[in-house]
């Protein structure tokens, strides 16, 4: 019963923020969301979970305090609480910094890898997907008030590079996915400078891919690369799905992740942001290295093990229709990209 109440609080907090036009109610939704998710992060109770929940609380509380401070400053200078009406440059800058901290974007990304490493995969799934929606909604609305889009461009490039370099030599899957999240969010923030609609489309597709990889890891009960190398012994189908989704996260054709990078690159080049596109692609090449390394180790290598584990491949496997649909969207959405572009009327 308590878990259901907390899940309802997370849902209501996010919805309140996403559909609010006032900074006060947006802040209130963020607070409801934060107070609901922290007790869930403590289960199962352990020293690592307690440490991660404390880090998450401090970072989110600082960000929320900055948001209410900046929105109050904007109210005193302009008399407006409306999110879409931001006239004070100091207030806009403070709110952008606060949203960067909430999203875990560079240069304020320090908390995200440590928090994800300390929680279980189920909470990692929520933090990496659902918890991104409310701050991203606010950031898209605030970005329309920016006179200088180079702020978003700088944040985007720093996040992609930080995610790429941070993911190198990681052996823990949750930390690796945290740096992957930082890198992909950098791409989404970058396209905000030229197209809000495209940023929404790429956000939804990325969250679907991220949802898929976390559900596969939960199914395989893998938190380290060595665990993933033995996943073939549990279920070969989930093992294959994991490899395909990793390649999609890396942005290789013909998978869905390639559509994200192709559409964003095309939109940026159409707006003469060629240097930014080159930097984003360079950062993605770094990320692609550890995706390919992980796929190679998962598909072709075998961690040191004993003979008993090689007989577990007949373990019962129960398929879930929703998870399978998410998996298909994660790897096979590229042929539908022309339809999606026309549907959302994206300006390339």
Curated annotation (Swiss-Prot):
Substrates-to-products reaction catalysed: a ubiquinone + NADH + 5 H(+)(in) = a ubiquinol + NAD(+) + 4 H(+)(out)
Any one Pfam family match given in the protein's UniProt record, by short name: Proton_antipo_M
Gene Ontology molecular-function annotations: NADH dehydrogenase (ubiquinone) activity
Cellular component aspect of the GO annotation: mitochondrial inner membrane
Signal sequence bounds: none
Annotated membrane topology: Multi-pass membrane protein
Residue spans crossing the bilayer: 1-21, 23-43, 56-76, 92-112, 123-143, 148-168, 176-196, 198-218, 242-262, 272-292, 321-341
Enzyme Commission number(s) from the entry: 7.1.1.2
Subcellular location: Mitochondrion inner membrane
Keywords: Electron transport, Membrane, Mitochondrion, Mitochondrion inner membrane, NAD, Respiratory chain, Translocase, Transmembrane, Transmembrane helix, Transport, Ubiquinone
Gene Ontology terms: biological process: mitochondrial electron transport, NADH to ubiquinone
Keyword Amino-acid biosynthesis belongs to the record: no
Biological role stated in the UniProt entry: Core subunit of the mitochondrial membrane respiratory chain NADH dehydrogenase (Complex I) that is believed to belong to the minimal assembly required for catalysis. Complex I functions in the transfer of electrons from NADH to the respiratory chain. The immediate electron acceptor for the enzyme is believed to be ubiquinone.
PANTHER family per the UniProt record, alphabetical: NADH-UBIQUINONE OXIDOREDUCTASE CHAIN 2
Similarity annotation: Belongs to the complex I subunit 2 family.
Name the record gives this protein: NADH-ubiquinone oxidoreductase chain 2
Organism: Myxine glutinosa
């Amino acid at each position: 019963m308590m878990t259901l109440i907390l899940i309802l609080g997370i849902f209501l907090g996010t919805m309140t923020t996403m559909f609010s036009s006032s900074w006060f109610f947006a802040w209130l939704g963020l607070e409801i969301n934060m107070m609901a998710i922290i007790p869930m992060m403590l289960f199962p109770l352990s020293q690592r979970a307690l440490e991660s929940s404390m880090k998450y609380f401090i970072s989110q509380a600082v960000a929320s305090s900055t948001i209410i401070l900046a929105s109050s400053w904007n109210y005193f200078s302009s008399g407006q609480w409306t999110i879409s009406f931001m006239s004070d440059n100091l207030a806009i800058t403070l709110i952008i910094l606060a949203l960067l901290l909430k999203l875990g974007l560079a240069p304020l990304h320090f908390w995200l890898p440590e928090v994800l490493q300390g929680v279980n995969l189920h909470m990692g799934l929520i933090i990496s997907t659902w918890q991104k929606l409310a701050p991203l909604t606010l950031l898209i609305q605030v970005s329309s008030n920016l006179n200088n889009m180079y702020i978003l461009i700088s944040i985007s490039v720093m996040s992609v590079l930080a995610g790429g370099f941070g993911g190198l030599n990681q052996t823990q899957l949750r930390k690796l996915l945290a740096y992957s999240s930082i890198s992909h969010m950098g791409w989404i923030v970058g396209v905000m400078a030229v197209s809000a609609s495209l940023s929404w489309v790429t956000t939804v597709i990325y969250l679907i891919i991220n949802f898929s990889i976390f559900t596969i890891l939960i199914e395989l009960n893998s938190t380290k690369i060595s665990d993933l190398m033995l996943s073939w012994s549990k279920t070969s189908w989930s093992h294959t799905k994991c490899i395909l989704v990793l390649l999609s996260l890396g942005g290789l054709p013909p998978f869905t992740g390639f559509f994200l990078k192709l559409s964003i690159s095309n939109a940026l080049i159409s707006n003469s942001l060629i240097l930014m596109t080159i930097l984003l692609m360079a950062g993605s090449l770094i990320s692609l290295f550890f995706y390919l390394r992980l796929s190679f180790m998962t598909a072709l290598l075998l961690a040191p093990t004993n003979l008993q584990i090689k007989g577990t491949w007949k373990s019962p496997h129960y398929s879930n229709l929703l998870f399978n649909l998410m998996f298909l969207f994660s790897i096979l959405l590229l042929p539908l990209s022309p339809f999606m572009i026309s549907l959302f009327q994206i300006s390339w």
